[in-house]
Each structure stands twice: as C-alpha cells, then as structure tokens.
UniProtKB/Swiss-Prot annotation:
PROSITE patterns found in the cross-reference section: FGGY_KINASES_1, FGGY_KINASES_2
Binding sites annotated in the UniProt record for ADP: T12, R16, T271, G315, G416, N420
Residues annotated as binding glycerol: R82, E83, Y134, D249, Q250
Record GO biological process: glycerol catabolic process; glycerol metabolic process; glycerol-3-phosphate metabolic process
Means of activity regulation: Inhibited by fructose 1,6-bisphosphate (FBP).
EC numbers: 2.7.1.30
Protein name listed in UniProt: Glycerol kinase
Family affiliation: Belongs to the FGGY kinase family.
GO cellular component, one term: cytosol
Keywords attached to this entry: ATP-binding, Glycerol metabolism, Kinase, Nucleotide-binding, Transferase
Residues that hold sn-glycerol 3-phosphate according to the record: T12, R82, E83, Y134, D249
C-alpha cells in the first residue's frame, strides 16, 4: 500500500526531495546545492543539466535512505523557484543556454520600455504584475533575441519554454522519449504572459514580447483531476508514480501553511522573502506595490488568488556575507555573530543586489551599507543583515494592510531562515505582532506534497490538512513602539540612498 507522498523542491540554491506520511510528517529527505553562475554584473544563471542531475540524485537517495520504493509512493509533487526561465530542444533534450534566474537583471531595459509606451498598464491589468526584470516574459524575449537558433526552432515547434517545474516534469516523464511539457496556473501567473481571468496565455501579452505561442506549455490546475504524467521505470524512482501536484514555491508554502481561507497570510524566508495573502476567488489589484497572482487551483474548482509582496534578497544576503565577504563560514553563524552586539550600531544594510522589489519596484536601485563608523564591526553588519530581512518584510506587511484594510495580528512564517531565532525575534520587534512557526518549517515541499496527495485521494480535503498543522515556536515583540518607529525611520532613510544606482 502506498503510505507516502514524495515532493521535489527545486529551489534557487538547492534541490531537495522530501517524503511525507499521512500526518504531514517528514520521514526522509536529501538535498544538494547547485552552482550559482554570475557571468556579469546583474546576471544570475543556473545550469539546467545540473539541476536535473541534482533532482535525479536527491529523489533516488531519499528513497534509499528511507528504504522505500516507487510502490510506496501514492504521488509526487513538484515545487520550484518561480520565474526562472529555461529553453530546451524537444528532440535532443539539450538546453540552448543556461537558465536565467529570477534575480537576474539583464532585462532592465526591456522592462523599462514596457512602461514608457503604455504596455505596462495592460500587463498590470491582465497579468497582475508590473513590468520588471523579475518575471519570465522579458527573460524569454532576451533568449529569443540573443541565443542563436532559438527563435527559428521556437517558430518550428522544436524549442520548448518552461520554468523549472516544466523542465523537471518533462525529464521525469521520459524527456525526449515521452516527456510531458506542462506547467500549472501558479507558475504561469509569474510570466507576464498569462491572463489571470482566462488562465491561458494571452495573445496580446505574447505580442508585447514577440513570443511564439507554440513554445509554451499547456497550463493546468495545481492539483489536477488527471495527473500531469507518470515517472518512468528508467527514472530516479525506478517505477511509475503519478506526478499530481505542481506549484510555484511561494504558493506551495501557502498550501503547506494551510492558508486556504481568505485573509490568511504567510511569510517564507528563503533566498528572498515572499509574503502572500489569500484573497479567495476575488481578483484584487494592488494600489501599494504588491502583485496579484494565482494562489492555487485544485481540480475543477475556481482558482484562488493572492496578493504577494516579493523581496528579492534576504537569505541570499546572508549567503553574500559568507561567499563574498567571508565574515562567516556558514549561514548559522550569522546569528552567533549578530548576538555579539545589542543593536546595529547605526548601520543599515539595504541588499538591493537585484534592484528593489515590493513595494518599490525600482530596478535602478543597488545595494548599500550606510551609517558606518570606526566603531562598527562584523557583528554590526551581521545584525544589520538580519534587520534588513525584517524591515523589508515590514514594508510589505504595511502595503498588504493598506490594500486589504485588515490589520495583521499574527504572521505565520516558514523557510530556512526561521531557524535563526534572533532573526525571528527581530521580525516580531519590527512588526509589533506575534510571529508563529509551524512544526514542519519546510512548508514549500509540504505544500507540493499536499497538492499531489489531494489529487489522488491520499488526503481527503482541506480539513485533513488543517489537522496536520501544529505550532512549534512563537515570538512576541520585546521593544517599545518608540524604538520600533526609530529603527524603521532609519531603514527608510537608508533605502533612499540606494535609488538611481544605475541608469535604466
């Protein structure tokens, strides 16, 4: 009997496979990092072949370490870094170029041009997104214009576009032999190419980027009536298992946090931070710099929408302290170092490495460390880095409250940085509300498992999922309103220093 569901979480810095039981408890996992390719200033790439090799390895290893086989799995769910753009040949299976990662800013001039001639307003209305380097449409246009042979092959139906979910599912289902080219509504809603009302590729939006429709995958529900496809005997699982769930990573975290009612919200702390608010079946367009996006679609039901505040650089700022500055040797050391000081010593770090996302959407911004004096140490910079994560989240919370008219009383959190207890305390202090972490912090992988399990009847309904959610830790504010306001004012001043950092 199949008593487990597997989940593939293809993230920005690593790929992991996790296996869950009926209670939503992790019974096994394996995780591998992949290389971050930085060929030029502002460019961020991944090797698609390396991503697929990592996916194969973590899936196979997760089964081996748990002593399970394909027959023990009821379904597989996939979740992924959104917006990251891949193009490959359907006959050879080879990518035409490296994947252009969501953080990449090479398309800044494409994005700026969309706003100058009025196309940006149409994109906002139809796709719910502002023209920005973040989203897939401009990245795909760049590949079509700059990589030899792609446009010709795309027009002939030989070149396939996809976000990482499409690439992983295509390979899992047989690749050049029998690969299924598909995506779900949540990933498609991050491209600037899908109409939020029709849930289909929009011809007018495609024309803005000169994208041939035939290279795009069909769009399906996140938890479809029929599986996307099946793994193969020759694949990493060694047998046929239905692939029955597909969600962009932040939408998967919403499902994993069981934020299934309008008004429920979560904040995921990963490479970036992503705060989503469930708005139900209502399409809510933001007046405060947030995105309108598909939250999920289960079966034949209507889609559920969300408002999202996307922050480009949070966890990757800690990674920068490790990899570029060398002041820590591991991410966990950021907490120990930051605890050596009581405050930031007047230092603010605005990590606008990819410009500023919500609520500013300023691709001209660049990172800055301000307020330095000879008094300051590495510990102050580590503290300022953790504060930057939390101040950026506060800006998004304020925008969300303004759009929804609802005061946030509790913030559900998940993701790797929630292991940093000091960072979570700073978050409670900067917001002035309780911050709550569930027992299963890896809610992205859990959400993909839930979507797949619901599709095949492994879990009956949303109530089954709610029964699985349990609180693990809670942080409450420990500072005065006056001190909270003073710190935030310093942050806002620092942000202004980052603007107009480059010409676009």
């Amino acid at each position: 009997m199949a008593d487990f569901v597997a989940s593939i979480d293809q993230g920005t810095t690593s790929t992991r496979a996790m296996i869950f039981n009926h209670r939503g408890e992790e019974v096994g996992r394996h995780q591998l990092e992949h290389q971050q390719l930085l060929p030029r200033a502002g460019w961020v790439e991944h090797n698609p072949v390396e991503i697929w090799e990592r996916t194969w390895s973590v899936l196979a290893t997760s089964l081996n370490v748990t002593g399970l086989s394909a027959g023990d799995l009821a379904a597989v769910g996939v979740t992924n870094q959104r917006e990251t753009t891949l193009v490959w040949n359907r006959h050879t299976g080879r990518p035409y170029c490296n994947a252009i990662v969501w953080q990449d800013t090479r398309t800044d001039k494409i994005a700026a041009a969309l706003d100058r001639d009025g196309r940006g307003d149409i994109i906002r209305r139809k796709a719910g997104l502002p023209p920005a380097t973040y989203f897939s449409g401009g990245k795909l246009q760049w590949i079509l214009e700059n990589v030899e042979g792609v446009r010709r092959d795309a027009e002939n139906g030989d070149a396939l576009f996809g976000t990482p979910d499409s690439w992983v599912i295509w390979n899992l289902t047989g690749g050049v032999r029998s690969g299924v080219h598909v995506t779900d509504v949540t990933n498609a809603s991050r491209t600037m190419l899908m109409n939020l009302e029709t849930l289909d590729w929009d011809d007018e939006l495609l024309s803005f980027f000169s994208i041939p429709r035939q290279m795009l995958p069909p769009i399906k529900a996140s938890s479809p009536v029929e599986p996307f496809g099946f793994t193969t005997q020759l694949g990493p699982l060694g047998g046929e298992v239905p692939i029955a769930g597909d969600l962009g990573d932040q939408q998967a975290a919403m499902v994993g946090q069981v934020c299934l009612n309008p008004g429920e919200a979560k904040n995921t702390y990963g490479t970036g931070n992503f705060l989503l608010l469930n708005t139900g079946e209502e399409l809510v367009h933001s007046s405060n710099g947030l995105l309108t996006t598909v939250c999920y679609q289960f079966g034949d039901n209507k889609p559920v929408y969300a408002l999202e505040g996307s922050i480009a650089v949070t966890g990757s700022a800690v990674q920068w302290l490790r990899d570029q500055l060398g002041i820590i040797s591991g991410a966990s050391q950021s907490e120990d170092l930051a605890r050596q000081v009581e405050d930031n010593g007047g230092v603010y770090f605005v990590p606008a490495f990819s410009g500023l996302f919500a609520p500013y959407w300023r691709s001209d911004a660049r990172g800055a460390i301000v307020g330095l004096s000879r008094f300051n140490t590495n510990a102050h910079l580590a503290r300022a880095t953790l504060e930057a994560i939390c101040y950026q989240s506060r800006e998004v919370v304020e925008a969300m409250e303004a759009d929804s008219g609802v005061r946030m009383e509790v913030l559900k959190v998940d993701g790797g940085i929630t292991a940093n207890k000091l960072c979570m305390q700073i978050q409670a202090d900067t917001l002035g509300v309780d911050v709550v972490k569930p027992v299963v912090a890896e809610t992205t992988a859990l959400g993909a498992a839930y979507a797949a399990g619901l599709a095949v009847g492994f879990w009956k309904d949303a109530d089954d999922l709610r029964r699985n959610w349990q609180e693990d830790e809670r942080w409450s504010s420990s500072i005065t309103d006056e001190k909270r306001a003073e710190g935030f004012a310093g942050w806002k001043k620092a942000v202004q220093r980052t603007l107009d950092g480059v010409d676009v």
